[in-house]
Amino acid sequence: MDPEVTLLLQCPGGGLPQEQIQAELSPAHDRRPLPGGDEAITAIWETRLKAQPWLFDAPKFRLHSATLAPIGSRGPQLLLRLGLTSYRDFLGTNWSSSAAWLRQQGATDWGDTQAYLADPLGVGAALATADDFLVFLRRSRQVAEAPGLVDVPGGHPEPQALCPGGSPQHQDLAGQLVVHELFSSVLQEICDEVNLPLLTLSQPLLLGIARNETSAGRASAEFYVQCSLTSEQVRKHYLSGGPEAHESTGIFFVETQNVQRLLETEMWAELCPSAKGAIILYNRVQGSPTGAALGSPALLPPL
């Protein structure tokens, strides 16, 4: 396994649809206050704001844990235990210079390396075209995380979407609405980043959850989504620009039959950790189980 990514959870073959997933929101699933108090988080945030005054804080869902139901059991197959966190807390924990120490201290104090970390839950998509290519984007060098690297479409589900005009509280966030936001957010990210019409996208299937070890184990839920457009049609939509076009500088495609061998190619080193997690889960859950001997991935030329 690539050291930049670890798998927290792998869904059953094919992936799980929305109706097979439950979410439990509780303050018990929030991060623990830092051992020396949270003043360090405030100091980091204020320093970042001075250097980047355009930054703004926003609430995020925090993944505490996830449990699959026993094989063959009826009802929902996956339970997500979620708390609330924020972008500010992410910068002050997962992205702080003391992140490794916080993980060690969490293991010592609570038996959980993530106990003191914000761990905002992200989403990503293995997006397949009608002519059997997966879609990749080259991240802009202006973005804060993984600038210039190759990614899959993705982002974050937003608690604020379920509480417009208010401050999200655990008791106000019904589990099924949270699951719906999780699934709809990955579709919205595809629409915004690749500029695709929503009606061209299938309902997502959850492949699993991967941790980004370069940001102290921040988790991302990775999905499989099919698009009814060909790769060339997707390229044309992307080129016409979308709401988040500034976040990437180019689009390219890898044949799905060759994705199994992606780890053995030079392209793998260009993938950001979240994209690596998405591809590993795609290969294990949705991709060809045979992993037939294939050559290097056939790429449609990048822009």
Swiss-Prot record:
A motif (Nudix box) lies at residues 175-196. It comes from the Eukaryota. Its EC number is 3.6.1.45. GO terms for cellular component: nucleoplasm. PROSITE patterns: NUDIX. Hydrolyzes UDP-glucose to glucose 1-phosphate and UMP and UDP-galactose to galactose 1-phosphate and UMP. Preferred substrate is UDP-glucose. This is Uridine diphosphate glucose pyrophosphatase NUDT22.
